[in-house]
Amino acid sequence: MDRRGDAKSREMMLDELLGYDHVTIQCHDNPDADAIASGYGLYCFFRDKGKDTRLLYSGRNKVRKANLMLMVEKLHIPLEYQPQMEDTVDGLLITVDCQYGAGNVTELPAEEIAVIDHHPLEVICTERMRLQPNMGSCATLVWTMLQEMHYPVEKNRDLGTALYYGLYMDTNQFSELSNPVDMDMRESLNFDKNQISLFRNSNISLRELEIAGVAMLRCNYNDDYQFAVIHSQPCDPNVLGLISDFLLQVAGVNTCVVYKDRKSVV
């Protein structure tokens, strides 16, 4: 047993997935910083092993959140948006920060599947799974797996910056950091402080600020049950999360629902 809390002999290792010439890494729909960072870590590993590697996400919405677009651009992350895929994925499909068949990820047609995630088990879809829900971020899990392969993460500053930012965002700016492995990764990464500051200070665009402000001004509040309902203009789904996070910091609001219309569907 080690800090990760599981016997190493029962953990899927990355070298078990090297038998495929083609590897597709899929983040969950509406990917956040942790999903993108985790996918990028796996992308770098398989690319450097000579594999034909793709990093993509699917779903109804393309990434439009300012900090995530900057993250992808500044760290040169080759993230593709694949809204539809009719052909079966060639080679191996790895879902990262999500589980194949779960509700937050589009199910791409694939015959060979692996799962790497830091959330509790949702779907049993393959024997090739690495789930460690005791970790604060999936970036930490991917970093751990790269360390097991003696992969030189420290030589890739873009990757180090991505992993650092993934952990930062998924642990609420490190305020929910408790696992020693998360702390080990944070202390060991070679990252660009200026880029982290840029991402941190670009969490919302001026247009998104306007959408959030108008939505909160029109908040419907029930004093008896202390809940709020907010209808937002069309926006990135992550902005709905920002609005709800802010609203839950208001005294007297214990529960909230924030939603937007999507054509004829809410």
Tell where the protein language model's regions lie, with residue ranges:
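A structured phosphate/pyrophosphate-recognition subdomain
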Residues: 2-30, 40-47, 123-263
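Anionic-ligand anchoring segments at beta-strand to alpha-helix junctions in alpha/beta enzyme folds, i.e.
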Residues: 20-86
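Residues at the starts of beta-strands that form the adenosine-phosphate
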Residues: 22, 52-54, 92, 111-112, ...
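Active-site environment of divalent metal-dependent phosphoester hydrolases
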Residues: 62-63, 116, 237
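Short, basic, glycine/proline-bearing loop/turn elements
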Residues: 67-71, 87-89, 225-233
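Active-site cofactor/cluster-binding pocket
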Residues: 73-128
